[in-house]
Amino acid sequence: MWLEILLTSVLGFAIYWFISRDKEETLPLEDGWWGPGTRSAAREDDSIRPFKVETSDEEIHDLHQRIDKFRFTPPLEDSCFHYGFNSNYLKKVISYWRNEFDWKKQVEILNRYPHFKTKIEGLDIHFIHVKPPQLPAGHTPKPLLMVHGWPGSFYEFYKIIPLLTDPKNHGLSDEHVFEVICPSIPGYGFSEASSKKGFNSVATARIFYKLMLRLGFQEFYIQGGDWGSLICTNMAQLVPSHVKGLHLNMALVLSNFSTLTLLLGQRFGRFLGLTERDVELLYPVKEKVFYSLMRESGYMHIQCTKPDTVGSALNDSPVGLAAYILEKFSTWTNTEFRYLEDGGLERKFSLDDLLTNVMLYWTTGTIISSQRFYKENLGQGWMTQKHERMKVYVPTGFSAFPFELLHTPEKWVRFKYPKLISYSYMVRGGHFAAFEEPELLAQDIRKFLSVLERQ
């Protein structure tokens, strides 16, 4: 009898696993209200309003006064960026910021693209919307939503946008011409922050889906890295029939399967689906994964637990804010940059570009609300939310940049995204792909579209 029960149980489990293993689940498309107070009975204003970035002499004067009060602490000898942002190099950065950086000029650059705001679920959502200046005969532009992460902003996409919207004038084929929409995550930059607890990536994905509908797009493509990769993933889980293609340059795919391959991959990598390049980027696993993630994730523990505490200090000090943000643009671009006195920052970025991104946090006072996004998404622990355990069933492309904080092998990506149709090992670049290597990322997005359209 017990043998029959055991065999029946095993058979039942096998049938359940076989039936459910490829079940294309979707997240429920709910509704929300994140503005202050209770939701009004009146219909929400769905108008789309032009917006312009502005500044003032008073704003700049206040910034300069605060910079002038910076209190310098000498770094330890030969510490480079191992202890965080090297304060000797910080002096150079703030001297440039105080005496040479032209915020009014950068505001003009920000306003080169059309900005808009619209109210969704009680929040004023900011976005830029860039249409192609010209189209080949018989072509229509492909709508592409691009989503930033932390501590970035919509400004990360300024150099890649013309490569996507006007490829012919930038030495590229006009086979794929895009209409690009770059929103600011609520609580970042010019998008209003939630007044209520619980505003996470799924809520953001739903709002951005509503934004695309409001702009008249029933079907569209989406692209993201960092938080943008999770938000875009959630969009594909919420409304897969509306997402024609998903392109990522980062993927949160840690699972029992990836853990197993990490533990056994150095010896049995080929049998576990790892390539020689995967093994090169992941091993020795103690240094390249475990020690590296421990060393670079301290900020995450703070922001997942008590974001308002550190945020209050950063929101009061522009120099502290710059050090906190720019240290990520050093190490996340290449972890080896921590061995350099200047963190390698100007090897990949200009100080004007870096400080413009910092100013988008400083002038809007959004560092605290941006950090709260960590607590809302990760504060309850890993793999505690439904979407983390769900697969994604839309055509997917992936760019694996070699200096991303954690390399993600194709086998891992395919486990989460079974319809992966394009996976590229990029020749250089790190976490801030669109900001650092716009040409490479644009080429891979176009490659993904070519593969998708051939199918």
From Swiss-Prot:
<feature type="transmembrane region" description="Helical; Signal-anchor for type III membrane protein">
    <location>
        <begin position="1"/>
        <end position="21"/>
    </location>
</feature>
<dbReference type="GO" id="GO:0006805">
    <property type="term" value="P:xenobiotic metabolic process"/>
</dbReference>
<feature type="active site" description="Nucleophile">
    <location>
        <position position="226"/>
    </location>
</feature>
<dbReference type="GO" id="GO:0019369">
    <property type="term" value="P:arachidonate metabolic process"/>
</dbReference>
<feature type="active site" description="Proton acceptor">
    <location>
        <position position="431"/>
    </location>
</feature>
<feature type="modified residue" description="Dimethylated arginine">
    <location>
        <position position="295"/>
    </location>
</feature>
<dbReference type="InterPro" id="IPR000073">
    <property type="entry name" value="AB_hydrolase_1"/>
</dbReference>
<feature type="topological domain" description="Cytoplasmic">
    <location>
        <begin position="22"/>
        <end position="455"/>
    </location>
</feature>
<keyword id="KW-0472">Membrane</keyword>
<keyword id="KW-0492">Microsome</keyword>
<keyword id="KW-0256">Endoplasmic reticulum</keyword>
<dbReference type="GO" id="GO:0120253">
    <property type="term" value="P:hydrocarbon catabolic process"/>
</dbReference>
<dbReference type="InterPro" id="IPR016292">
    <property type="entry name" value="Epoxide_hydrolase"/>
</dbReference>
<keyword id="KW-0812">Transmembrane</keyword>
<comment type="similarity">
    <text>Belongs to the peptidase S33 family.</text>
</comment>
<dbReference type="GO" id="GO:0008142">
    <property type="term" value="F:oxysterol binding"/>
</dbReference>
<dbReference type="Pfam" id="PF00561">
    <property type="entry name" value="Abhydrolase_1"/>
</dbReference>
<keyword id="KW-0378">Hydrolase</keyword>
<dbReference type="GO" id="GO:0033961">
    <property type="term" value="F:cis-stilbene-oxide hydrolase activity"/>
</dbReference>
<protein>
    <recommendedName>
        <fullName>Epoxide hydrolase 1</fullName>
        <ecNumber>3.3.2.9</ecNumber>
    </recommendedName>
</protein>
<dbReference type="GO" id="GO:0004301">
    <property type="term" value="F:epoxide hydrolase activity"/>
</dbReference>
<dbReference type="GO" id="GO:0009636">
    <property type="term" value="P:response to toxic substance"/>
</dbReference>
<dbReference type="InterPro" id="IPR000639">
    <property type="entry name" value="Epox_hydrolase-like"/>
</dbReference>
<keyword id="KW-0058">Aromatic hydrocarbons catabolism</keyword>
<keyword id="KW-0216">Detoxification</keyword>
<dbReference type="GO" id="GO:0097176">
    <property type="term" value="P:epoxide metabolic process"/>
</dbReference>
<keyword id="KW-0443">Lipid metabolism</keyword>
<comment type="function">
    <text>Biotransformation enzyme that catalyzes the hydrolysis of arene and aliphatic epoxides to less reactive and more water soluble dihydrodiols by the trans addition of water. Plays a role in the metabolism of endogenous lipids such as epoxide-containing fatty acids. Metabolizes the abundant endocannabinoid 2-arachidonoylglycerol (2-AG) to free arachidonic acid (AA) and glycerol. Binds 20(S)-hydroxycholesterol (20(S)-OHC).</text>
</comment>
<feature type="active site" description="Proton donor">
    <location>
        <position position="374"/>
    </location>
</feature>
<keyword id="KW-0488">Methylation</keyword>
<dbReference type="GO" id="GO:0005789">
    <property type="term" value="C:endoplasmic reticulum membrane"/>
</dbReference>
<keyword id="KW-1133">Transmembrane helix</keyword>
<dbReference type="InterPro" id="IPR029058">
    <property type="entry name" value="AB_hydrolase_fold"/>
</dbReference>
